[in-house]
Amino acid sequence: MNTARLNQGTPLLLNAVSKHYAENIVLNQLDLHIPAGQFVAVVGRSGGGKSTLLHLLAGLETPTAGDVLAGTTPLAEIQDDTRMMFQDARLLPWKSVIDNVGLGLKGQWRDAARRALAAVGLENRAGEWPAALSGGQKQRVALARALIHRPGLLLLDEPLGALDALTRLEMQDLIVSLWQQHGFTVLLVTHDVSEAVAMADRVLLIEEGKISLDLTVDIPRPRRLGSVRLAELEAEVLQRVMRRGHSEQLIRRHG
């Protein structure tokens, strides 16, 4: 990992965090510590609590119980240090690419926006409209929009899910490269276990609102696609997910 990082990531500490929607318990007294600058991927079946966890960290929702901290400080108090990317790039079609990157900023921000676009390989598209961009290019703009704020925490909610296979691999490499350069903490939610293992330091499996697997990805970078160790770790996570699904089917069948 590159030690010459530009900024320090946000350390995260969740203590007995729960989130309820009426009688539905989505997160159930979840405990989690993520050191500053770590890249963590969260996987699991739909409805297990992955996106809810991300929304709590982004300040889009509040926990029913428990504490969400950045070190010893409530994360909500430093929310400006957090940026989030979604599957939809959410660009404003009536604003140019560079204006989308600088959205909400005041003062002399255009040079910083150009640097952010250069970092994602789009320095020559600054004056164009979002409609002229491919899906992968739109996500690069969304990434540049996050970078310009020099975040301590980058939250990724399935940002690559709608991309074709080659573009997806290119974006994976770009995100990892920028993470290594800048040192922010990353939390990636994905349904793609191979993506999680390829990108992250650590993979969490959330089931029924709790962390049921916390797996360290002990593979040096850069990682070689198709390596035996990557395949072994991917299989370990998938077997755990499938075992839980098989158990639920047996319960329904014999209950």
Curated annotation (Swiss-Prot):
Localization per record: Cell inner membrane
Membrane topology summary: Peripheral membrane protein
Catalytic activity: ATP + H2O + aliphatic sulfonate-[sulfonate-binding protein]Side 1 = ADP + phosphate + aliphatic sulfonateSide 2 + [sulfonate-binding protein]Side 1
Broadest EC class assigned to this enzyme: translocase
Keywords carried by this UniProt record: ATP-binding, Cell inner membrane, Cell membrane, Membrane, Nucleotide-binding, Translocase, Transport
Superkingdom classification of source: Bacteria
Annotated ranges, domain ABC transporter: 12-233
Gene Ontology CC terms, in alphabetical order: plasma membrane
GO molecular function, a single term: ATP hydrolysis activity
Pfam families: ABC_tran
Chief site of localization: membrane
Gene3D superfamilies, alphabetized: P-loop containing nucleotide triphosphate hydrolases
Binding site for ATP: 44-51
EC code: 7.6.2.14
InterPro entries per UniProt: AAA+_ATPase, ABC_transporter-like_ATP-bd, ABC_transporter-like_CS, ABC_transporter_ATP-bind, P-loop_NTPase
Family: Belongs to the ABC transporter superfamily. Aliphatic sulfonates importer (TC 3.A.1.17.2) family.
Subunit structure and binding partners: The complex is composed of two ATP-binding proteins (SsuB), two transmembrane proteins (SsuC) and a solute-binding protein (SsuA).
Described function: Part of the ABC transporter complex SsuABC involved in aliphatic sulfonates import. Responsible for energy coupling to the transport system.
Name the record gives this protein: Aliphatic sulfonates import ATP-binding protein SsuB
Organism field: Shigella flexneri serotype 5b (strain 8401)
